[in-house]
């Protein structure tokens, strides 16, 4: 009889992401000024064209607890997804949700009703946007899998996603709190659109039709034509 704790050993992409985040944290601990250069700040993206920030901010964290929480969540929710999707699709989804979270922050920084002026000059760091995207995917693919709130109360994953989504939405309307709720909301939204949006259905239909065309083409190509009964001379394989 064997026992296991958690989703299991780290697959390759998650292992590399954790290493990259830890290395970035150690570097910023020695040279904290890097945060201002590689963190997400809408004023710098729009005003100074620091176009790398919507990607690089995902690898920076404001403190040890922030880093540990995100890496733990990456492990908890990401391992099964990477095994199911494969490393390439998982990595693409991770960056889509992380950059989508940054895009949401950038757009809302231009909306006065969403606290845009304050958000415009604020600095956002952390992998939370991508992690929230993974949480959404986990809830969609494993809706009845229990997630333990405060390590005590089991909640089905689909309801847990609804709860954190509602918290992120209403918190994003409530002004400054020191937490990037707009990025959390953006990660959830980007993940949903990527997995369930019109583009996904269109691409699935295209992939199905392309695969069907390839199968039919292969059948025509390898059909065996018989020139006469009992004779091998006129048989051809295309």
Task: Give short role names for the model-derived ranges.
Residues 1-13, 20-22, 168-238:
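C-terminal transmembrane module of polytopic alpha-helical membrane proteins
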Residues 3, 13, 54-138, 169, ...:
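Transmembrane helix-loop-helix
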Residues 24-36:
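Alpha-helical transmembrane segments of multi-pass membrane proteins
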Residues 30, 76, 80, 139-144, ...:
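Structural signal for the C-terminal ends of transmembrane alpha-helices
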Residues 34-59:
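Extracytosolic (periplasmic/ER-lumenal) interhelical loops and adjacent juxtamembrane/interface segments
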Residues 83, 141-153, 199-206:
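Alpha-helical transmembrane bundle and helix-membrane interface signal
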Residues 155-160:
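Select subsegments of transmembrane alpha-helices in polytopic membrane proteins
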